[in-house]
């Protein structure tokens, strides 16, 4: 089944962007997934094609109108999860990417300005999703990031399906260090265990390094990993 991605945006020309290259681009050409963009401005209700207005109660900036967004959303089949890219949303992570990759598709709403009228979130049951604790100029960049994370997990996208299973976050840890030729670079050698041919020793070393890196760089992630490990 083809994964169907739909993006509601004021800037459809931003898509597929970098998703037209490498793994995602090849998968798009091969028909593993499809991408449709919907121009929100096409659903404006006045001759000026306005999609925003001043915030109720005053304040800086503009807010995207609920009626315009509703018309844009209602023009699309309600056949997939509907997400609003938002800095106040649920944190997007690898587990959620894997969950969405098992769905038939996803519909992404890209906000602009100061955000969207709260009533469209309630009325169309949009789930807010965030890719990090920072502010972007709009939801398009976040949507591209989210789709990249999802598409690479679709069956047939990665040449070696095992490639994704040892990456950061897949087992609750950051990924272990990687090495390749030359064996010596500016006096730095590949750890001998990796060239020993001893598969058990290599696996143990990689696990130890993953735990060490996670404990040093992401203590909150390691605490969760350790808690789950103790349960089992």
Curated annotation (Swiss-Prot):
What top-level branch of life does the organism fall under? Answer: Bacteria
Cite the binding residues for S-adenosyl-L-methionine: 111, 131-136
List localization entries.
Cytoplasm
GO BP, one annotated term:
tRNA N1-guanine methylation
Q: What is its EC number?
A: 2.1.1.228
Q: One GO molecular function term?
A: tRNA (guanine(37)-N1)-methyltransferase activity
| Record GO cellular component, one term | cytosol
Which keywords annotate this record?
Cytoplasm, Methyltransferase, S-adenosyl-L-methionine, Transferase, tRNA processing
Instruction: Tell me if Isomerase is a UniProt keyword of this record.
Output: no
What this protein catalyses is: guanosine(37) in tRNA + S-adenosyl-L-methionine = N(1)-methylguanosine(37) in tRNA + S-adenosyl-L-homocysteine + H(+)
Q: What's the short name of a Pfam family annotated to this entry?
A: tRNA_m1G_MT
InterPro entries, per the entry: Alpha/beta_knot_MTases (IPR029028), tRNA_m1G_MeTrfase_C_sf (IPR023148), tRNA_m1G_MeTrfase_TrmD (IPR002649), tRNA_m1G_MTases_N (IPR029026), tRNA_MeTrfase_TRMD/TRM10 (IPR016009)
Q: Which top-level enzyme class is recorded in the Swiss-Prot or TrEMBL entry?
A: transferase
Q: What does this protein do?
A: Specifically methylates guanosine-37 in various tRNAs.
Q: Which family does it belong to?
A: Belongs to the RNA methyltransferase TrmD family.
HAMAP family in alphabetical order: TrmD
Q: How does it assemble?
A: Homodimer.
Protein's UniProt name: tRNA (guanine-N(1)-)-methyltransferase
